[in-house]
A protein has these predicted regions:
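Non-catalytic alpha-helical scaffolds and adjoining flexible linkers that form interface surfaces
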Residues: 1-196
């Protein structure tokens, strides 16, 4: 790599991992593309983001080699990427009464609340969270990066977790992602084919 007039040019590189298994599954490939789009949005030129790069590589590896459930890898990437970029939600309890078992998550504020504590006049979308989902969110935000995939939820809760993390990330970034839309259309088609 060399610099010329303030521009850096890479003149040689070596591939460490091609993630070849991703090419065999269109859903995995579209999810990997979504991760790349998010990483591009969260990265700034001339500011290294090694933690985000490591998260991206670990999630690509999780998709390609570990065969983790897609909803789990997606949720891990979305929530941890948000945290690494300064959008860490407050997951310590209801922001009104302090209860450790709130059942709603506000996508705009990143705060938890109990159903009874909700202020009807306040705006924002609140999604229901179970104790298992809440514990998984806390784990993703605060665990050692090497243990990101070492939590377990049943498939319906993993799917709900994925919806919550997606809603939180896209709300915080105030944008949508074309690769995410494509991934969701593939999942919908896949689910329709399985139900027939």
């Amino acid at each position: 790599m060399f610099e010329y007039r303030g521009q850096y040019t890479i003149n040689e590189a070596h591939v460490l991992n091609l993630f070849q298994n991703l090419r065999a599954d269109l859903e995995q490939l579209s999810l990997a593309s979504y991760f790349a789009q998010v990483a591009e949005v969260l990265s700034q030129e001339d500011y290294p983001t090694p933690d985000l790069q490591s998260l991206l590589l670990n999630c690509l590896y999780g998709l390609s080699n570990l065969k983790q459930p897609l909803d789990q890898v997606k949720a891990v990437f979305e929530l941890r990427a948000a945290c690494l970029s300064g959008y860490t939600p407050d997951l310590f309890g209801c922001h009104v009464c302090g209860s450790q078992t709130p059942d709603r998550f506000d996508l705009s504020s990143g705060l938890l609340e109990c159903q009874n504590c909700r202020d009807a006049s306040s705006g924002g979308i609140r999604l229901p969270v179970t104790p298992g989902i809440l514990e998984a969110m806390r784990f993703i935000c605060f665990c050692d990066p090497k243990k990101l995939f070492s939590f377990r939820l049943n498939q319906p809760e993993l799917h709900r977790l994925s919806q919550v993390t997606e809603g939180f990330l896209t709300t915080q970034l105030e944008r949508s992602f074309s690769a995410l839309d494509y991934y969701k259309s593939l999942r919908l088609n896949h689910e329709e084919m399985e139900s027939t």
